[in-house]
Amino acid sequence: MDASKVQELFRRAVASDDAVSMREGLEQMLGLGEHGGLSPEREYGLRRPDFVMDMPQSRERIRGRDALRKMQDAFPSPAPAVILRKVTGGRHVWVAEAEMDYGGDRWQTVVIFELDGHGLIARETRYYAREFEAPAWRAELVEAMD
């Protein structure tokens, strides 16, 4: 997988509000569907050198793509299985909703991507929520989601 192809999809998404290109770029970057995914080394090239990632729930910030690369290297294996549910947004800001499965420990995830005009990721803000059982009192008011 070539990072330049993913960057071109991101650049197209930014230039023309193209959600299909953004989704395809994310699928290729993450290795979803029939795509092989990018290694952390190639993914590195999709982020600006001054990239920032915020994780507000744990009050953590990673500054620089080099720091993110070190975090990726230290991540316990295996990486989670990802199901990309929805990609929405426009121009420089895109939101991805996904389900991440860490070996049976499932989390709902929202990632806000901020991209520059060249299709590079400048900033990510990541939110994680653990799944939980819905309360019985509202069962008649809602429908179950898959």
Give residue ranges: language-model regions.
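Glycine-biased flexible loop/turn sites that connect beta-strands or occur in inter-domain linkers
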Residues: 118-119
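Short, surface-exposed coil-to-beta transition loops
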Residues: 79-82, 105-112
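Short beta-strand segments that buttress and anchor functional surface loops
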Residues: 95-103
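Short acidic-aromatic low-complexity motifs
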Residues: 1-49
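Low-complexity, intrinsically disordered terminal/linker segments enriched in charged
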Residues: 1-12, 127-146
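A solvent-exposed, acidic/Ser-Thr-rich amphipathic alpha-helical stretch
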Residues: 38-92, 133
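A generic structural motif
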Residues: 101, 113, 127-128
